Swiss-Prot record:
This is Light-independent protochlorophyllide reductase subunit N. Pfam families: Oxidored_nitro. The gene is bchN. Coiled coil: none annotated. Belongs to the BchN/ChlN family. It catalyses: chlorophyllide a + oxidized 2[4Fe-4S]-[ferredoxin] + 2 ADP + 2 phosphate = protochlorophyllide a + reduced 2[4Fe-4S]-[ferredoxin] + 2 ATP + 2 H2O. Pathway: Porphyrin-containing compound metabolism; bacteriochlorophyll biosynthesis (light-independent). Keywords: 4Fe-4S, ATP-binding, Bacteriochlorophyll biosynthesis, Chlorophyll biosynthesis, Iron, Iron-sulfur, Metal-binding, Nucleotide-binding, Oxidoreductase, Photosynthesis.
Length: 427
């Protein structure tokens, strides 16, 4: 059992820690940060997200969330119309009116986010000042914050990063030694991790963001935080500015990634090796057995990642090491080397890496490689399927619970399912 659990895996040859990266600066095809509201409004259960944007923003949110507006979801769009764009209306006065009406109708709201968009940035609407002004009117009943979900030079997962970074200055101060798990994960996954931490004797443990506005975790010099998502660079910097220290680790995708993630935490909190093995061992073995069936379908297959979610590097590591797949290119919108250093060290040596997007050039390389599966955005999937390539929507890997041991097989299945579908269609 020790051989299974006490792993400090040698990198595949020399890994990709110092590998050259192709920097692309061309045409892009990505969703904007507003997409993050879809999972954030489910995570923070008494928060409301008010997008200040266009009808296009409203259509995107409603379509992505799959929620009809008459169901009164905890998000909405304050539409910027022609009068606002022409400067004929006082946008701040209109915003105050909308917020006042919203909070009168929805007394259950405890935290309100004013979310900037491309249109609000174009007309230079200062939502941070608006949030301060409105907070004075509605405090302490409602906390009002602002962040940007604009798609200008960003990708869709950065909406969560800017949201959490805006929350960090509002967190209470604490000197207590504690663990903070940073990044939105499904409630069921959070509960699973909490049981593991309880078994290891690690505590107190806080998850950020919390499920309720009043339960946001404290932060200070005693805080040790570990990222659950690789796209939280601004949030990590904000926490470090508050005195917290980040624990470097691979991300908890797959049996190996989850074990190494927990191992980094256990080391920091001086968990005995025997206890770690007894708590983590059965869970890892169960995950490894569940993954074995999927490995037979994926081993030796080629995978190509278009830059979209910033999950690409950890997912490539999982597919290469645990599923036996061959990454022919791993493209990511932004390569934060410091955050993914542990992942890069575990990638197969010589794996082509690219940062940014030049869509036409990447399409040419993808067509030339003829991978067995392509991980890409929604806009590319159907055209590539029409060319005979099998695709997986990258946004599905964000929406689906894929962290931890119990979800490892679900993560693998997201890649086997498109291949099975293609096989049935051909037959």
């Amino acid at each position: 059992m020790n051989a299974v659990i006490d792993i400090a895996p040698a990198p595949m040859q020399q890994g990709c820690g110092d590998a050259p990266v192709l920097h692309e600066r061309g045409q892009r095809e990505v969703f904007c940060g507003l997409a993050g509201i879809v999972w954030l409004h489910r995570k923070i259960q008494d928060a409301f997200f008010l997008v200040v944007g266009s009808r296009t923003c409203a259509h995107l949110l409603q379509s992505a969330a799959g929620v009809m507006i008459f169901a009164e979801p905890r998000f909405a769009t304050a539409i910027i119309d022609d009068r606002d764009l022409a400067g004929l209306a006082d946008a701040n006065a209109e915003l105050d009116r909308v917020v006042t009406r919203l909070l009168e109708r929805r007394p259950d709201i405890k935290m309100l986010f004013l979310v900037g968009s491309c249109p609000s940035e174009v007309i230079k609407l200062d939502l941070s000042r608006a949030a301060e002004r409105l907070s004075r009117n509605f405090s302490p009943r409602v906390r009002i914050l602002s962040y940007t979900g604009s798609g200008i030079d960003t990708t869709f997962t950065q909406g969560e990063d800017t949201c959490l970074a805006a929350l960090v200055p509002e967190l209470p101060a604490s000197e207590q030694r504690a663990l903070m798990v940073v990044g939105s994960i499904a409630d069921i996954v959070e509960d699973q991790f909490r049981r593991v931490f309880d078994g290891l004797g690690i505590g107190p443990v806080h998850f950020f963001p919390a499920r309720h506005a009043g339960d946001m975790p404290p932060v200070g010099p005693g805080t040790r935080f570990v990222l659950a998502q690789p796209f939280l660079a601004d949030t990590a910097r904000a926490l470090e500015a508050r005195g917290a220290r980040r624990l470097a680790a691979p991300f908890p995708f797959g049996a190996e990634g989850t074990t190494l993630w927990l191992q980094a935490i256990a080391r920091e909190f001086n968990v005995e090796a025997t206890k770690f093995v007894s708590v983590v061992g059965p869970r890892r073995e169960r995950a490894a057995r569940a993954l074995a069936r999927h490995r037979t379908q994926l081993e030796g297959r080629k995978v190509f990642f278009f830059p979209d979610s910033q999950l690409e590097v950890p997912l490539a590591r999982f597919l290469a090491r645990e599923m036996g797949m061959v990454p022919v290119e791993v493209g990511t919108p932004y390569l934060h080397r410091q955050l993914v250093a542990s992942e890069l060290a575990l990638l197969p040596a010589g794996t082509p890496l690219s940062e940014g997007q030049d869509l036409e050039r990447q399409l040419d390389r993808c067509r030339a490689a003829r991978p067995d599966i392509v991980v890409c955005g929604l806009g590319l999937a159907n055209p590539l399927e029409a060319e005979g390539l099998t695709t997986k929507w990258s946004i599905e890997l964000v929406f689906t619970p894929v962290h931890g041991f119990d979800q490892a097989a679900d993560l693998a299945e997201l890649f086997t399912r498109p291949l099975e579908r293609r096989t049935r269609l051909v037959a």
